[in-house]
Design a protein with these regions (language model features):
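Short amphipathic helix-loop junctions that connect adjacent transmembrane helices
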Residues: 1-16
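Residue-level signature of mid-helix packing/kink "hotspots" within the transmembrane helices
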Residues: 24-32, 116-117
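Helix-to-loop junctions at the C-terminal end of transmembrane segments
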Residues: 30-43, 127-128
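Structural signature of the two symmetry-related core transmembrane helices
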Residues: 45-60, 140
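Helix-loop junctions at membrane interfaces in 12-TM secondary transporters
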Residues: 62-73
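Intracellular juxtamembrane helix-capping segments at the cytosolic ends
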Residues: 83-96
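A membrane-interface helix-boundary motif in multi-pass transporters
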Residues: 125-142
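Multi-pass alpha-helical transporter architecture, strongest
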Residues: 139-162
Length: 162
């Protein structure tokens, strides 16, 4: 949907392809150093930061009125992807016993994969019915909700170990 938004904001097909290539290059360049940063600051902090970056990117795509701004948020999305994807998996591995790590990560990817279809359908329906801004604002709100759920447990205390 990010690439469709770039197209909607006036980029040509070739420019969208170039933007996606640059996104992937930036992601590849940032993944290793951000993995090291996650080791230093803590996986929980990196996962929380990832939820926040995701929300910021989706707010940006909702409010972007030019392709220039949307491109900036696409490259911020590369930062999110590089920071969150590895840290999220590593954090998951801290939540289960050693003998269950591979199964837990497999289950996580299964659930994410299965839920991507209805999530994408809902996003597309929101876009068609109410416009891109409504769809992206909904995504941002859900990311902020996920961040809040991640940050606190039922007693209002921090829910992750660092």
């Amino acid at each position: 949907f990010l690439l469709l938004r770039l197209k909607e904001l006036g980029l040509s097909q070739e420019e969208v392809a170039l933007a996606y290539t640059l996104y992937n290059l930036l992601y590849a360049l940032l993944a290793y150093p951000l993995g090291g940063l996650a080791d230093r600051v803590g996986l929980g902090r990196m996962v929380a930061t990832g939820f926040g970056l995701y929300a910021l990117v989706y707010l940006g795509f909702a409010w972007a009125r030019t392709a220039f701004w949307a491109l900036g948020f696409l490259f911020l999305y590369a930062l999110y992807s590089a920071a969150f994807e590895g840290a999220n998996r590593a954090y998951l591995a801290t939540l289960v016993p050693e003998e269950a790590k591979a199964g837990a990560i497999g289950l996580y990817h299964t659930v994410v994969g299965v839920l991507l279809l209805p999530a994408s359908l809902l996003f597309g329906l929101l876009w068609q019915a109410f416009g891109a801004a409504a769809a992206f604002l909904t995504g941002a709100a859900l990311a902020l909700g996920a961040l809040l759920l991640f940050l606190v447990d039922g007693t209002g205390r921090r829910a992750y170990p660092g």
